[in-house]
A protein has these predicted regions:
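Negatively charged
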Residues: 1-333
Length: 333
């Protein structure tokens, strides 16, 4: 089909709602492969979910997106495969799920992503396998699920990931098997299931890489007196994951100072942990809901000070402690 069906003079999109109306009208008149370059989007800052679940696969190569800050889920589960290689994305802060489960496999090698902080799920479930080796990801903090279930196996070994805190599920079920041995992971907190069922795991590389990451994490979690302090539930969960990975499910976790943690809900839910936490100072904990639900934990925690706990809902339901009749005497649902 010719472009004439929806080609016209430039129309400035006043705001996000106006942009959506222009796109809808153009597609209705010209079909999903029409040319949308007649729309001036230079005033638009928010493009979150703009083509979410869309059949659009036309031309937006000339769009001026230089003021856009949010491209999260922009092409989420869409049919789009067009050329956006020349886009100026230098102000974009979020690309969360931008191409999630989409058909996109285009060239984005020259994109300036230096302002992006959130790349979670960016290429998850896509056929994308392009060159992004030169991307400046120095400001990215979240990469969870970034390449999950994708075919990506490009070179990202020189990326500066020193500010990334979350890489959980990053390569789960992916084809990635590259060299990331030189990554600086000084800020990394969460690597849960990072390589699960991936080629990286099957190649045997994940154990060595995670061993280094977890050990570094524990080392930098120590204070000046050598104590490992958990400031909150999330940090505590990360410390537990690290200790169990390095030392197994029967490890001693009494080295973790939990005196500042207030929330412990679901902490060992469905967990294989069966080590020692008898010396934990839980005197400031307020919620222990489902803490050991369906867990294998069978240790002695009778001496815990739970005087400030307000809720213990189903704390031991389905647990080994319940089955053995060893639920602590202080437990009150």
């Amino acid at each position: 089909m010719t472009d004439s069906a929806c080609s016209r003079r430039k129309i400035v999109a006043r705001d996000r709602l106006h942009l959506e109306e222009l796109i809808k009208d153009a597609i209705e008149k010209g079909g999903p492969e029409c040319d949308l370059n007649f729309i001036d989007v230079s005033n638009i800052m928010d493009m979150f979910g703009l083509f979410d679940y869309s059949s659009f696969n036309g031309n937006i190569s000339e769009w001026d997106v230089s003021n856009v800050t949010d491209m999260g889920q922009m092409f989420h589960r869409s049919a789009f495969t067009g050329d956006i290689s020349r886009w100026n994305v230098s102000k974009v802060c979020s690309m969360s799920g931008m191409f999630y489960d989409s058909a996109f496999n285009g060239d984005v090698s020259q994109w300036d992503v230096s302002s992006v902080q959130d790349m979670r799920g960016l290429f998850s479930g896509t056929p994308f396998n392009g060159d992004i080796s030169q991307w400046n990801v120095a400001n990215v903090e979240i990469m969870s699920g970034m390449f999950a279930s994708s075919v990506f196996n490009g070179d990202i070994g020189n990326w500066d990931v020193s500010h990334v805190k979350d890489m959980s599920y990053m390569f789960v079920d992916s084809k990635f098997d590259g060299d990331i041995s030189h990554w600086n992971v000084e800020s990394l907190l969460d690597v849960r299931n990072m390589f699960r069922e991936s080629e990286f795991e099957r190649s045997g590389k994940s154990r060595l890489w995670l061993n280094r990451v977890y050990q570094e994490f524990l080392d930098r979690s120590k204070d000046s007196n050598g104590r490992v302090i958990a400031l909150n539930r999330d940090r505590l969960e990360n410390l537990i994951d690290a200790a169990m990975f390095l030392n197994g499910p029967k490890c001693d976790l009494n080295f973790i100072d939990v005196s500042q943690v207030k929330m412990m809900f679901d902490l060992f839910k469905n967990s294989p942990f069966d080590g020692d936490i008898s010396q934990w100072d839980v005197s400031n904990v307020e919620c222990m809901d489902n803490m050991f639900t369906d867990s294998l934990f069978s240790g002695n925690i009778d001496a815990w000070n739970v005087s400030r706990v307000e809720s213990m809902y189903e704390m031991f339901d389905g647990s080994v402690l319940e089955k053995l009749g060893k639920v602590p005497g202080w437990y009150k649902e």
